[in-house]
Amino acid sequence: MTKLTDEVKKRRTFAIISHPDAGKTTITEQMLLFGGVIRSAGTVKARKSGHYATSDWMAIEKKRGISVTSSVMQFEYQGKRINILDTPGHQDFSEDTYRTLMAVDAAVMVIDSAKGIEPQTKKLFKVVKKRGIPIFTFMNKLDRDGREPLDLIAELEDLLGIEGVAMNWPIGMGKQLKGLYDIANNRVELYRKDDDDRYLPLDKNGKLAEDEPLAQDSLYQSTLDDIDLLKEAGNTFDKEKILKGDQTPVFFGSALTNFGVETFLDSFVNLAPAPQEHIVNGDEKLAADDPEFSGFVFKIQANMNPNHRDRIAFVRIGSGEFKKGIDVTLARTGKPVRLNNATEFMSSERVQVSDAVAGDIVGLYDTGNFQIGDSIYAGKKKIVYPALPQFTPEIFMRVTAKNVMKQKSFHKGMNQLVQEGAIQLYRGYSTDDYILGAVGQLQFEVFSFRMKNEYNSEVELHTLGNRVARWINPDQLDPKMSSSRNLLVKDRDGEPLFLFENAFAERWFKDKYPDVELTSRL
């Protein structure tokens, strides 16, 4: 085994997905605690105290208590190198989340045990399932009264079509929570006990010693009944199915009280896969431990350091080893680029990195070379990773600078924020209008907030409302086709498209111009 292969096998790169408020950021914090990265976990609820979650680093995230960008955090744990991508739960930021899911080898799905599977979780699950990567489930908020565990397991199959296999089982919940029956490790983990007293061994029949006080508790007896039912009618643990994404190991716990999180993390590190091969150049397989360095840009973030007004391109290394000063080729342009400055992350904090391997996420200081979806490679052979998803916006607004004397900062801010990919920029086809398009309303609020706070440029947004965006072949375009109901604009690449007032306006256009072909993005 080569040193590179050995290093790659230590990597565990995963994203955490959930519906807003299911506790995703809190469980991330607890993992960082176990990784020795932070001394205390700050939950979103603590925002009045000025104590914020490590992964919520942007000013607007701290102000509103929601994650709106994907954070990257890295730490060592049990001889493994952990790379966590904490994705935004808010549905308006699904673009950032979808792209992030292209850069991971596994996903952790956090579910509120009182609510079960919620719409955003379902949406994100579909993307992960499509990729065929393993999914690990953490049923959170066991410190509150919630739904029956058997119902939660059944819901995984009913709503998501994936087998759930219980790795542990609650002994009570809410105020009556006593502990977890740890099926995988044949022990009971007691709630609110210190390390030495936390675990009670089970005998070969899966039962506590009779002199244990908990053994006489009716909640424990009820749990044993559930365990018997699981053995008879539940799914059998199958690692092969897990790695294919056909079965999900299910762990119960409470991220807020840090209960069951360590057990979950230990199991995850052992079960989750190391970086896998990628399909490149259309249909070629590229091994993660291939000696030639390559990777792809899945995210661009401006102003991670507000003092320097910088831009960072986040790169998932797909193969080989990164070394400081390495010369690579940018596949899109064929131009050589020397990678002198690379960084690793703890949210907005960063550390200079001199080497990294497949599976790692590195940040490259970007002076405008990179775009989301770019492939880079160090060898002579061109390597191009699959295109990342791009979404058709649904809401559009005209944007102007409030202060006409600040056009320079207005243009700089707008261009940098657009390059991050959460909001898209269009120009009037025969006017100088700037039009922004986004998947949801919150993206405009974030844009406006960041323009003011990061670029000192207040903007005015004039709504065009919900529009149906459809691209048109330039050869078929006649500017006279445009009207107030189907606004003609061009995208960042200069490609023409119509913004239809509604589906009816689109149908009317198609009836009038039956030979014109209109296309949409994702």
UniProtKB/Swiss-Prot annotation:
Subcellular location: Cytoplasm
Keyword Membrane: no
Amino acids binding GTP: 18-25, 86-90, 140-143
Keyword hit for Cell inner membrane: no
Cellular-component GO terms for this entry: cytosol
Sequence ranges assigned to domain tr-type G in this UniProt record: 9-276
Keyword terms: Cytoplasm, GTP-binding, Nucleotide-binding, Protein biosynthesis
Superkingdom in the source lineage: Bacteria
A single GO BP: regulation of translational termination
Gene3D superfamilies according to UniProt: P-loop containing nucleotide triphosphate hydrolases, Peptide chain release factor 3, domain III, Translation factors
A GO MF term: translation release factor activity, codon specific
Role, per record: Increases the formation of ribosomal termination complexes and stimulates activities of RF-1 and RF-2. It binds guanine nucleotides and has strong preference for UGA stop codons. It may interact directly with the ribosome. The stimulation of RF-1 and RF-2 is significantly reduced by GTP and GDP, but not by GMP.
PANTHER family, per database record: PEPTIDE CHAIN RELEASE FACTOR RF3
Family to which the UniProt record says this protein belongs: Belongs to the TRAFAC class translation factor GTPase superfamily. Classic translation factor GTPase family. PrfC subfamily.
Record's protein name: Peptide chain release factor 3
Organism: Lactobacillus gasseri (strain ATCC 33323 / DSM 20243 / BCRC 14619 / CIP 102991 / JCM 1131 / KCTC 3163 / NCIMB 11718 / NCTC 13722 / AM63)
